[in-house]
Amino acid sequence: MDPKILERLRLGLSDDERRLVIRSATGGEEVTEYSFGIEEEYFLVDAKTLDVAIRTPDDLFDAANWSTGGQAMREMLQAQLEVATNVHVDVGDAREELKFLRREVASVAGQYGLTILACSTHPTALWRNSQPTPKPRYAEMMEDLRIVGQRNMLCGMHVHVQLPDPDRRFAVMRAMIPYIPVFIALSASSPFWNSRETGLKGYRLAAYDELPRTGLPELFTSKKQYDRYVAALTKSGVMPDESHVWWAMRPSLRHPTLELRAPDVCTAVDDAVAIASLYRALARHLYLNPELADAVGNVERAIAVENKWRAQRYGTDCLFVTEDGPVTGQEILNRTIADVAEHAEALGCLAEVERCRTIMQFGSSADYQLQAYRESGGQLAAVTQWIAAATVSRAEPPQSQPSVEPVR
């Protein structure tokens, strides 16, 4: 292996980390069915105060991009940074790479007096102070979106799963609609907004849905239908290309993947990998059983819209609407895992899928943030301190387990 790769990536790490990033630097895993990748967005914050960084230097992003081998990049606002893993088949490699990327961008940010927070809303950031990234693409977006774009001080997690057949990919997207609220509940990490407790576990999507072309996917049955929709919008000058379709799930513009975009960014890496693994196993289940898409129609989508709201509001504590009456999140998850267990086993990620039960039982990042807030007597600084510690290490949870909100 060319030693310049190691020098370029600034590696003086363990053998396992060295092996992982060498693989990444030389092309990653071979792309196969159900291979996957994870994208995460972080807030850049002052390393001492943990206040969000409104303006950030170009050099920081150049250094982060160089340091990670091209896997860190700007986002729409200067306060944000995105990382993307390589394509993976082995879930353990994906976990280690995600840990590496977090440590690496935090290290680079530290050279500028900054660090990163993995949460979907910054507890004290004021969206009115946000500044767009000085790139033509983002300037055009801000010209179109105006205040809605400025309010987009939000970070999410996206998971790509490779599904080669285009029409079957759309069958999976349709069949996946009722499950999207489960991913929202498991990932919720945005209970605060503009220094206020919102009352929602996942406020991010409430703000994000102000943008056009968001929310749950439409009930398209084929790539041809989707292409007609995209063509109408692009020919009418509404958007330059299909990357401006910002649904909670969408087919990728550049890759043969189906991209889950609904989740909040997880504060804990293990939670992120668990949710990505559940999505991957479910995608395999639905891809191999395309007839399941036929069961998702207007009624099922309308119920999913309601459940999306309930997942945002109550997180892991919510009751989900079904035609047979209310069902707990834990029961919905148990049923889902029963359906996908053999697929998770085949993909080598059953243990990660099982971790979703722990999240549903004890809570997501939002619950731990709220616990830190209450145990500190309502100090938002305690919340950001916990997030900062948990983003790049296995931080201890607040002193007691999150209190369980009465289910509604």
From Swiss-Prot:
InterPro entries xref list: GCL_type2/YbdK_subfam, GCS2, Gln_synth/guanido_kin_cat_dom, YbdK
EC number: 6.3.2.2
Keywords attached to this entry: ATP-binding, Ligase, Nucleotide-binding
UniProt-listed GO biological process terms: modified amino acid biosynthetic process
Catalysed transformations (reactions): L-cysteine + L-glutamate + ATP = gamma-L-glutamyl-L-cysteine + ADP + phosphate + H(+)
GO MF term set: ATP binding; glutamate-cysteine ligase activity
One Pfam family of this chain: GCS2
SUPFAM superfamilies in the cross-refs: Glutamine synthetase/guanido kinase
Keyword presence, rRNA-binding: no
Summary of the function given for this chain in its UniProt record: ATP-dependent carboxylate-amine ligase which exhibits weak glutamate--cysteine ligase activity.
Family: Belongs to the glutamate--cysteine ligase type 2 family. YbdK subfamily.
Designated name of the protein: Putative glutamate--cysteine ligase 2
